[in-house]
Amino acid sequence: MNIINYYFLFLVIVLSFKSNGQVPKVYTNISLDRGNAVATVKGKEYRESNNGAGFHLQDLIGNPQGTQTGVKFNFGPKVPSGKVYFGLINPTDGKYPMPVYFRRTAKISASVTEINLIQLRGKYDMSGWEKSNGGFLGYRVMGPEGQLLYDGRLSFKYENDMFRVPPSIIEGPTINQLTDNSVVISMKLNKPGPIVLNVNDTKYESKGKTTIDFKISSLSPNTEYKYSLEGVVTRNYAFKTNLKKGDRTPFVFAYASDSRAGQGGGERNLYGANYYVMQRIVAYSKARNVAFLQFTGDMINGYLAEKQEMNLQYANWKRSLEPYSSSFPVYVAMGNHEALVTYFSNPETAEEFGIDRFPFETESAEAVFATNFSNPVSELKSEDGAAYDPDPKTKDFPPYDETVFSYVYGNAAVVVLNSNYWYAYALNRYPGTSGNIHAYIMDNQLEWFKDELKKYESDKDIDHVFVTLHTPFFPNGGHVTDDMWYNGKNWPRPIVAGEKVEKGIIERRDELLDAMINQSSKVRAVLTGDEHNYAKTKITEAMPRYPENWERPKLKLTRTIYQLNNGSAGAPYYAKEKTPWSDFATNFSTQNVVVLINIDGKSANIEVRNPFTEELVDALELAK
């Protein structure tokens, strides 16, 4: 893309922003100057700034074009040099075929490279592409500083002595929203084109789209279905529907969080995601025959200002789930690193803070998260209509979309919360623009949560409920200064349209605890992350939960549950810190682990394993 086209694209974005350029009423002291946000707080001006390397997903896909000898890519001006690893994928070589990388690489020069596919003939044609006149290619883009930027896929055809890149599945297929009688099979293409899906001898077709969600219904519970995708070569897959609601047949599911880029080089940082650890967690989960994996936040580095850069990091994370995500669902939730931010900075003071991007319907962290995943959708729409809503007649808050929901498998339910909704980076230090703090569940979400727990409490088919959100109720190492503790301070809370909400963070924590422990008999555990370690915390009436100077009412707990924190999926580790409840936090570990939750009728227990060594790190009976 030349500079004129880039300028035109920039102009379109700015004009689009300006045409929707009303500052949401929930914010304060923000104005727009030629499409850019400006915050003026206490006489000091902070202008919108960027934060990120500027890599975009569409650029890294590379606009592949066929040539006489292979496929040519253009990765854009942000990748002027580097190299590309590439290899064929044989779709018939096992259930979960992966790229087998060739011994040579392709050099990137002036942002352009060509993968020579002719050299993959003869003894190097391990996929039979010469016979079928086409095949599948995996490629990895390495930037000028040696960092892996993108892990790509494409299809190619060879006709009339010329290679051609047809509409190709570049992401997926993935199993989503699986129930006992339906499924959503999702995929993304490099360009619009026809896709034919066969499920149980029934054909489904999509045309003219790049993001496709095939919704398949009228399935039978606990049944394996084979499915295939027609293309250059037919690819075969399989999934198994859920147990019927109320079925008490034993099953296991997995839990983890915090897989943003780690240290150690290589795949530990596939631009924003720890591919190395995630791939092992998902492979081990599949080997243990889990029904599903719940992953709750900080998938990626995030904290970015550009949607296309966010999409790139999400794409890399989703690649780490493949090819196993073609056979079982991975449910995801937001963490603070899923933040998509409008940054404000003052160059004279080097101060910086940020808010959730707007327009909320298209640019917010919540909206972009929802476009990248296919989660269930709840009845909770937003915080509009809450007591602090500045204008009940207009939409003033971001959509919850697919960031807050619940789902059922057999006799168990999982309730997913968003503790980073409408998140304003550094709000406690820069409150002038308004926003929400890290870890705070706002009013409408709290009421929805209570209603969900009541629903499952009265449901005779549900024996076990698991609650998951990114931020611990009781942090133990890494986030003692925030999460739902803030070093024992209750004053942190959201600010809406310049006004602080009524309840502080510890008060809101107690309302959540009351709903889970005192008002529910079925919640077995709360699954959290944020802290990059594993720890099991026994939440009981005997556990110290308040600062020494606490003068407000104290919540009495009527039973015991456990907080299972597993933020060990590859982000840089945190060690254990001293807290009032330290004696109640046990089996602390900085090893990478996956929590396996075994359900067998009325009983439930956990098994915590290192997915690399398979060593048992912890075990606990949750219900007899």
Question: Residues of each region from the PLM?
Answer:
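Solvent-exposed loop/turn segments at secondary-structure junctions
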Residues: 259-262, 299-302, 336-340, 420-423, ...
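Short beta-strand segments
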Residues: 255-257, 294-296, 333-334, 416-418, ...
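Extended active-site neighborhood of metal-dependent phosphoesterases/phosphodiesterases
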Residues: 174, 224-238, 308, 312-459, ...
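Short acidic, glycine-rich surface-loop motifs adjacent to enzyme active sites
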Residues: 295-300, 456-481
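Bacterial Sec-dependent N-terminal signal peptides
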Residues: 1-23, 516
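Short, solvent-exposed loop/turn elements at domain surfaces
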Residues: 194-196, 261-266, 340, 416, ...
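Divalent metal-dependent phosphoesterase catalytic cores across multiple superfamilies
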Residues: 23-401, 503-522, 533-534, 591
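Loop/turn elements at helix/coil->beta-strand transitions in domains of secreted/extracellular proteins
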Residues: 249-252, 288-293, 325-331, 409-414, ...
